[in-house]
Amino acid sequence: MSKRTFQPSKLVRKRRHGFRARMATAGGRKVLAARRARGRARLSA
C-alpha cells in the first residue's frame, strides 16, 4: 500500500509557492507576469 503523496503543510506551501518565493527568481517573476496578464484573481499560494 502506497502512502498519500499530499501531506499538507501551510509553511511549506508558502515557502515553495508563495508570492515572495515567486518574486525571488526571474522565472518566478515571469510566472506572476503571465498570471497578471491572464487576469488571475489569485497570483500565488
UniProtKB/Swiss-Prot annotation:
Coiled-coil regions listed: none
An annotated GO BP: translation
Annotated disulfide bonds: none
GO cellular component, as recorded: ribonucleoprotein complex; ribosome
Pfam families cross-referenced by the UniProt entry: Ribosomal_L34
InterPro entries: Ribosomal_bL34, Ribosomal_bL34_CS
Keyword field: Ribonucleoprotein, Ribosomal protein
Keyword Ribonucleoprotein: yes
Keyword presence, Protein biosynthesis: no
A single GO molecular function term of this UniProt record: structural constituent of ribosome
Family indicated by similarity: Belongs to the bacterial ribosomal protein bL34 family.
PANTHER family found in the cross-reference section: LARGE RIBOSOMAL SUBUNIT PROTEIN BL34M, MITOCHONDRIAL RIBOSOMAL PROTEIN 34 FAMILY MEMBER
Protein name: Large ribosomal subunit protein bL34
Organism: Agrobacterium fabrum (strain C58 / ATCC 33970) (Agrobacterium tumefaciens (strain C58))
Origin organism lineage: Bacteria, Pseudomonadati, Pseudomonadota, Alphaproteobacteria, Hyphomicrobiales
